[in-house]
C-alpha cells in the first residue's frame, strides 16, 4: 500500500512539472556515471537527494555533472561526487537539476530522478536464499538505494495480496554506513519472488526462497507411514508436492512447520533404491534424495572352499521385478541364480583361502542388505584341521587338512601362558594344504601347544609338543674366581626350587652346582650362573645338566686386560697391572713395540707381571696373549719415564750472567706428574727456557757462585754437578748520549751480576745513574742473531754478551763533552774515561742507533776493534789476554 502511495504521489507531481528531454544513454560502472545528450537537448547539472517526500538530505556531499565535453554532436555529462558511491542514496522523491541550452538557469524542481534513465543497480550479488521460515540475506552492488527506501525493499507492485515489505538493516544517515552493502530480513514465505531496489518498480532482482532439503527418511512399515525430516517445507499443505520414483504422493501433511512432512498409506514390496523429490511452491529439492529398501537376510548355508557350490539365502525382500541383485560373500562374488521374496540362490566359486564369519551382502541397485536379528548373518567356509605335530632338529611339522597358504594362515605357540607368533615368512605349507613346517623359535618352557588359524578360523585340534633343553653361554669368565651366565630355553616349567642345574668342565670328575634358574629380559628366558675353575684359554668344553636332561657346550676365558703400569724405585723395573694374565710364564707372550719381551718377565700372577726396563725401550703399545687368548681391545700404550744423560755445562764448570744450564736425555717432557723432570740450582727451582724431549735449557735464578746443580725425575735423583759463574768483565764502553730528557749509556760485558752502582762524574757534579741488567740467553732474549744457513725452526746465539743499560734518574743539562764513568759490580769497582755526545732530535728514529761508534778508553788499558752495543764481537783486555765467545745452537719450535 505504501508503495502504491509513492507511485500515486509521483504521478500527481508530474502533472505540474516540466518534462525535459531524456538523455540518449546512461553509462555507469564502479567509479563513474556518464549521461550522454544530443547537443541541442537540455541536460542534468546535479542530483538533489531527498530523505522522504518533503525532506532534503543535508548530509550528502556536493555533486555535479561536468558537461563541457562534446564529441560528435553529443554532450557528455560526467558525474562528480565528493564522497564514495557507497554514500549515494536517496528516496524516490529525489530530483535532478537541469539546464536548457538557451537558458543557463538551473531548474531543480521539475524533474524526478526516476523520470528518465537513471543509474540502475549494478553488479548485484546476494549471500544466499532465505529459509521458508524467514532469514537474512546480504546484498552487495552499486546504486542499490538511489531511488528507494532506504530501510525497506518491495517484492511486488502489481499483486497486493502477495506484497510484503523486506526490512533493510542499517543507519543510512551514518556517514560510515555503506548503502551498497546491507542485510535484508525476509519474512516467512516460499516460492519465487522479485526484489525491487527502487520504489517505482523499474529495478528488480529475481529471487526465491531456499530449496527443500531432506535430512532423514523414516519408514514405519507397520503403520504404512513415511516421515521426512528436513527444512524449507513452509506451512501450507497445498504448496507441497512429494514424488516417490516420480510418482506423486497423496495424503501429505506438514506435521512440523518448515521441517517435517508425513506421507500416509505408503506400501512398497520390492527392495532397492527409491528417488524422493519434494517441491514447495514450485521450488524443488536441489538433488533428489535416495532411500534404500534393503533385502533382509535371516540365514545362509555353507559350501566347501575347495569345491564351491550353491549358497541359499533366506529372509524377506529377496526378489525384485526390475533389478537383478549382486551378491557378495567376503570379497567374492556369488552369481545370482534365482529368487523369491523369501529365498535366493547363488553360485559361489571355489576359494582356496576359505574364511570364517565373512560378511554377506545382497545388493539391489546399490542398496545393501541387512540382517533380521541384532547380530549380522555371516558366512564360513570349511574349517581347517590338525591331526599331529612333531619336532625334529629344531623343525616343527604339522599334519592336517585345509591348511591354506602362508598368506592366509597364522601359527601361534602357547608355552605355559606365554604367546609366540610365527611370522608367515617363517613357515611353509605344502601345495595340497596338508603339511606345514617351521623353525621352532626360542621358548622358555619345554612344552607348548600349537594354535593354527586360517583366515580367523581356528583348527579343531591343538597338538602339544616338547622340545629338548637348549643353552647359550652369554659371557666369558675371568681366569680366577670366574663364572659364566647361561641362557636356558625349553626347560621344565614351572621351576622347582629344589632342582638346581650343574656343570662339569672338561674331563673333570666332579660337577659344580649352579644357581636356581630365574627369569630374565622381560621374562623371555631363564638364566643360571655357574662357577668356573681357574684356567686360561679358549673353547673349553663343558657338560650342563638340569633335571634329567644334559646339554654340551663350550666357553672361553676372558682375554688379558691391561689397566695401568708402575715403576720400581729407581725406575729399573716396569710392572703391568690388569687381569687374566694367568700364572704360567710358559703360557704368556708379551710384545712391546712389536718385539717379544716375554723373556724379560721377572714375576707373574693373574693381576700383574714385572719385567726389566732397558734403556733401548721407547714409548709404544704393549700386546699380551695368554694361552692363545689375545686381548682384542685397543692395545695399551706404555709411556716410559724420562732418562737424563748428563748436565752439559759440567765440562767447563762455568755459566754466565744468564745462568743457562743444559740437560740432555730423552722423554724429558713427560706429562706424568710422577716423573716430571726438575732442575735445581742451590736447591732452588730453575726456569725452563727451551723445552724439548731430548734437551732442556733452563736458567738459574740464583746468582751465587759456586752453584750446585741437581736433577730429579719425580722424587728420584739424577745427575748433579757444581758450576761457577764467569768473573765479571767489562768489554764495551761506548760514548755517553746526552739527550734532551737526560743522559744514557749502554755498557757491554760478560757475567755482569751482583749489586750494581753507577754514576757519571763531570766537573760540576757527580750524576747518579740507574742501571738495568740484561743478561744474554734470557727467556725474552733480544740478542738472537738470525743465521740464514739454519732451518726455519732454529736460532743461532753467537758472541753474546751481557748488557748494562744506564740512564740518569732526572732530566739534567750537561754542557761538557767528557767525564768519568764509575761502576761497582758487587765488590769490584771500575772507572772509565768516557766521551759525552749531545744527541739532537731526529725525524728518523733509526739514525740514533745505527752505524759504528768509537769506544772510550778503559782505565789502565784499551779495548780495540769492538763494535758498540750489547751484542758485540771479541774483545781484548790489556793486562790479560781474554777471549770470550759463546756459540750455542738452540732448536726452538715457533707457534
UniProtKB/Swiss-Prot annotation:
Topological domain spans for side Cytoplasmic: 883-895
Gene Ontology CC annotations of this record: external side of plasma membrane; plasma membrane
Phenotype upon changing residue 359 to L: In strain: QS113
Keyword flag Lyase: no
Gene Ontology biological process terms, A to Z: aggregation involved in sorocarp development; cell-cell adhesion via plasma-membrane adhesion molecules
Pfam families according to UniProt: Ig_TgrO1, TIG
Variant or mutagenesis effect after changing residue 424 to I: In strain: QS23
Effect on the protein of changing residue 892 to Q: In strain: QS4, QS21, QS23, QS32, QS34 and QS113
Transmembrane segments: 862-882
Gene deletion effect: Cells are unable to sporulate when in pure population although they will sporulate when in chimerae with wild-type cells. Cells form loose aggregate before disaggregating. Cells aggregate and disperse repeatedly. After starvation, cells completely fail to stream and display cAMP relay defects. Fail to rotate. comC-/tgrC1-/tgrD1- triple mutants fail to form spores.
Major localisation: membrane
Keyword line: Cell membrane, Glycoprotein, Membrane, Repeat, Signal, Transmembrane, Transmembrane helix
Signal peptide: 1-21
Glycosylation site positions: 29, 52, 171, 181, 253, 257, 277, 288, 351, 368, 407, 428, 451, 481, 507, 521, 573, 583, 593, 623, 652, 685, 720, 757, 766, 780, 799
IPT/TIG domain ranges (all copies): 295-381, 560-638, 642-725
Role noted for this protein: May be involved in the regulation of aggregation. Activates tgrC1.
Name used for this protein in its record: Tiger protein D1
Organism: Dictyostelium discoideum
Amino acid at each position: 500500500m505504501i508503495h502504491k502511495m509513492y507511485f500515486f504521489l509521483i504521478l500527481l507531481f508530474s502533472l505540474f512539472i516540466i518534462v525535459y528531454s531524456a538523455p540518449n544513454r546512461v553509462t555507469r560502472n564502479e567509479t563513474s556515471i556518464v549521461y550522454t545528450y544530443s547537443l541541442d537537448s537540455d541536460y542534468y547539472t546535479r542530483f538533489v537527494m531527498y530523505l522522504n517526500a518533503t525532506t532534503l538530505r543535508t548530509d550528502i556531499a556536493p555533486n555535479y555533472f561536468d558537461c563541457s565535453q562534446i564529441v560528435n554532436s553529443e554532450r557528455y555529462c560526467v558525474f562528480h561526487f565528493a564522497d564514495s558511491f557507497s554514500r549515494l542514496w536517496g528516496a524516490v522523491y529525489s530530483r535532478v537539476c537541469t539546464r536548457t541550452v538557451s537558458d543557463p538557469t538551473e531548474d531543480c524542481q521539475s524533474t524526478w530522478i526516476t523520470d528518465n534513465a537513471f543509474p540502475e543497480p549494478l553488479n548485484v550479488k546476494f549471500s544466499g536464499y532465505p529459509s521458508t521460515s524467514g532469514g537474512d540475506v546480504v546484498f552487495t552492488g552499486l546504486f542499490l538505494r538511489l531511488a528507494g527506501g532506504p530501510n525497506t525493499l518491495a517484492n511486488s507492485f502489481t499483486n497486493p495480496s502477495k506484497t510484503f515489505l523486506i526490512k533493510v538493516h542499517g543507519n543510512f544517515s551514518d556517514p560510515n554506513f555503506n548503502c551498497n552493502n546491507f542485510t535484508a530480513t525476509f519474512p516467512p514465505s516460499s516460492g519465487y519472488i522479485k526484489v525491487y531496489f527502487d520504489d517505482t518498480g523499474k529495478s528488480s532482482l529475481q529471487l526465491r526462497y531456499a530449496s527443500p532439503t531432506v535430512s532423514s527418511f523414516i519408514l514405519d512399515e507397520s503403520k504404512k507411514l513415511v516421515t521426512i525430516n528436513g527444512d524449507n517445507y513452509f506451512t501450507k499443505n497445498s504448496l507441497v508436492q512429494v514424488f516417490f520414483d516420480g510418482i506423486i504422493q497423496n495424503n501429505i501433511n506438514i506435521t512440523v512447520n518448515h521441517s517435517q512432512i508425513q506421507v500416509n498409506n505408503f506400501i512398497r514390496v520390492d527392495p532397492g533404491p527409491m528417488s524422493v523429490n519434494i517441491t514447495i511452491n514450485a521450488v524443488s529439492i536441489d538433488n533428489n534424495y535416495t532411500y534404500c529398501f534393503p533385502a533382509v537376510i535371516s540365514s545362509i548355508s555353507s559350501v566347501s572352499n575347495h569345491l564351491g557350490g550353491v549358497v541359499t539365502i533366506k529372509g524377506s525382500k529377496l526378489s525384485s521385478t526390475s533389478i537383478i541383485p549382486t551378491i557378495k560373500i567376503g570379497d567374492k562374488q556369488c552369481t545370482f541364480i534365482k529368487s523369491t521374496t523369501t529365498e535366493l540362490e547363488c553360485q559361489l566359486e571355489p576359494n582356496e583361502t576359505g574364511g570364517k564369519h565373512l560378511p554377506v551382502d545382497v545388493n539391489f541397485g546399490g542398496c545393501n542388505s541387512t540382517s533380521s536379528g541384532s547380530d549380522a548373518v555371516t558366512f564360513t567356509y570349511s574349517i581347517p584341521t590338525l591331526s599331529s605335530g612333531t619336532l625334529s632338529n629344531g623343525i616343527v611339522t604339522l599334519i592336517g587338512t585345509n591348511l591354506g597358504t602362508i598368506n592366509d594362515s597364522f601359527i601361534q605357540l602357547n608355552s605355559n601362558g606365554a604367546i609366540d607368533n610365527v611370522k608367515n615368512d617363517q613357515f611353509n605349507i605344502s601345495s595340497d594344504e596338508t603339511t606345514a613346517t617351521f623353525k621352532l623359535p626360542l621358548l622358555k618352557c619345554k612344552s607348548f601347544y600349537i594354535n593354527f588359524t586360517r583366515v580367523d578360523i581356528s583348527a579343531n585340534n591343538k597338538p602339544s609338543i616338547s622340545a629338548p633343553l637348549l643353552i647359550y653361554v652369554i659371557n666369558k669368565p675371568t681366569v680366577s674366581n670366574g663364572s659364566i651366565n647361561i641362557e636356558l630355553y625349553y626347560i621344565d616349567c614351572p621351576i622347582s626350587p629344589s632342582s638346581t642345574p650343574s656343570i662339569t668342565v672338561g674331563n673333570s670328575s666332579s660337577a659344580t652346582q649352579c644357581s636356581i634358574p630365574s627369569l630374565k629380559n622381560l621374562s623371555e628366558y631363564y638364566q643360571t650362573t655357574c662357577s668356573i675353575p681357574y684356567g686360561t684359554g679358549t673353547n673349553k668344553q663343558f657338560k650342563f645338566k638340569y633335571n634329567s636332561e644334559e646339554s654340551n657346550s663350550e666357553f672361553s676365558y676372558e682375554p688379558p686386560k691391561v689397566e695401568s703400569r708402575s715403576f720400581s724405585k729407581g725406575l729399573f723395573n716396569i710392572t703391568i697391572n690388569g687381569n687374566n694374565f694367568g700364572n704360567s710364564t710358559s703360557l704368556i707372550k708379551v710384545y712391546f713395540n712389536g718385539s717379544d719381551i716375554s723373556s724379560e718377565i721377572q714375576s707373574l700372577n693373574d693381576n700383574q707381571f714385572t719385567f726389566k726396563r732397558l734403556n733401548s725401550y721407547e714409548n709404544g703399545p704393549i700386546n699380551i696373549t695368554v694361552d692363545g687368548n689375545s686381548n682384542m681391545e685397543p692395545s695399551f700404550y706404555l709411556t716410559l719415564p724420562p732418562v737424563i744423560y748428563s748436565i752439559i755445562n759440567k765440562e767447563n764448570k762455568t755459566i754466565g750472567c744468564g745462568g743457562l744450564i743444559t740437560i740432555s736425555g730423552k722423554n724429558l717432557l713427560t706429562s706424568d706428574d710422577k716423573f716430571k723432570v726438575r732442575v735445581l740450582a742451590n736447591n732452588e727451582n730453575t726456569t725452563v727456557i727451551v723445552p724439548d724431549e731430548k734437551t732442556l735449557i733452563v736458567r738459574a735464578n740464583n746468582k751465587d757462585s759456586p752453584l750446585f746443580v741437581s736433577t730429579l725425575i719425580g722424587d728420584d735423583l739424577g745427575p748433579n754437578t757444581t758450576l761457577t759463574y764467569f768473573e765479571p768483565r767489562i768489554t764495551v764502553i761506548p760514548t755517553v748520549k746526552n739527550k734532551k730528557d737526560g743522559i744514557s749509556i749502554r755498557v757491554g760485558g760478560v757475567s755482569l751480576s751482583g749489586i750494581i752502582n753507577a754514576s757519571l762524574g763531570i766537573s760540576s757534579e757527580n750524576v747518579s745513574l740507574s742501571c738495568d741488567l740484561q743478561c744474554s740467553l734470557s727467556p725474552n732474549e733480544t740478542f738472537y742473531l738470525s743465521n740464514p744457513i739454519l732451518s726455519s725452526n732454529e736460532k743461532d746465539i753467537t758472541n753474546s754478551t751481557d748488557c748494562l743499560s744506564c740512564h740518569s734518574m732526572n732530566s739534567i743539562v750537561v754542557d761538557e763533552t767528557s767525564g768519568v764513568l764509575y761502576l761497582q759490580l758487587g765488590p769490584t769497582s771500575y772507572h772509565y774515561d768516557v766521551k759525552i755526545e749531545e744527541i739532537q732530535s731526529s725525524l728518523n728514529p733509526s739514525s740514533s742507533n745505527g752505524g759504528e761508534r768509537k769506544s772510550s778508553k778503559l782505565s789502565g788499558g784499551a779495548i780495540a776493534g769492538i763494535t758498540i752495543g750489547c751484542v758485540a764481537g771479541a774483545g781484548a783486555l790489556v793486562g790479560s789476554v781474554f777471549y770470550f765467545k759463546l756459540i750455542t745452537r738452540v732448536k726452538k719450535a715457533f707457534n
